[in-house]
C-alpha cells in the first residue's frame, strides 16, 4: 500500500521522501511489491543504532501541534483533528488519574488499537505521563485461543483493564471458562467507544471484574482528546449500560435539530453540545 499512499500524497502536493518498512523477521521481506532504493528503508536495520540512546527533549510552545489524527469516518468523510502538546497532555493525564485511578505502581492495559485516539490518549500519553506501566500487545484477543487476554493479565500482573464493548461481546461468546482458568484481579475496568448493553456490562463486571472492579462507562470522541462523560470511581454509582455524567469542568447540553434545548428526562434524542472549552479539545 505504500506506493499507493505515496501517489495520493504526491497528487495532493505532498512529497514523501522516505518510507520505513517494518519486517517482522530480519532478512525476510515477503511483499510482492519491490523496495524502491533511496526511498524505502528497512526499519529493523536502523533500530540498533538507537537502542539505549537518550534523546534530549526539545522545548516547544504548549500550543504547538502534537499529532494529527483522522476520525473514523463512520458519519462522513474522515476529518483530520490536530491536538496540541500542553492542553492535550494535561487533559489525558488528568482523566487517566481521576477516571481510571492510574498510579505509578499500577500495571495498566488498554487493548485498543494504538492508531485510534483511545490508543494515543490512554495507551501512550495518559498512563505514561503518570509513570505507570502501560501494556501493549499485538494481534487479536482470541488467537490462539480466548484465554489470551487473561494469560497476559496474569503474567504481567495487570490490575487496570480498558477495552471496548465489541471486545467484551466477543469474549463473552466463549463463556466464563477461559477467564476462570487464570489468576488475575482488576481493581478498575473501563469501557469505551460505543454503548454497552446492560447484560454485557454485567458479564464484564461479574466474570472479568469478579464482582469487585469498578467500571467506568465513558463517552468522548477523537475531537475531544479525552473522556467527557464518565462515572468517577468511588464517587458515582455504577449503572449497567449507561455512560456516566459530565466530567468535572464539562458542561453539556442537548439540543434538538432546531437548536432548542431538550428537557431533562423527556426521553427525546438530540445532539450533545459542550458549552465550555476544555484543555483536550482539538485545535
Feature-to-residue mapping (PLM):
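Conserved AMP-binding/adenylation subdomain of ANL enzymes
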Residues: 89-107, 117-159, 173-176
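AMP-binding/adenylate-forming catalytic core of the ANL superfamily
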Residues: 2, 154, 161, 278-280
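Gly/Ser/Thr-rich phosphate-binding loop
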Residues: 47, 132, 159-163, 172-240, ...
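Conserved S/T- and glycine-rich ATP-binding loop of Class I adenylate-forming
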Residues: 65, 71-74, 96, 108, ...
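Conserved ATP/PPi-binding loop(s) of AMP-dependent carboxylate-activating enzymes
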Residues: 245-249, 260-283
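Short Gly/Pro-enriched turn/cap motifs at secondary-structure boundaries
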Residues: 57-60, 237-246, 263
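Conserved pre-ATP/AMP-binding loop-to-beta segment of ANL
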Residues: 16-27, 35-70, 77, 87, ...
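Short beta-strand->loop structural element characteristic of the AMP-binding/adenylate-forming
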Residues: 1-5, 80-82, 133-141, 170, ...
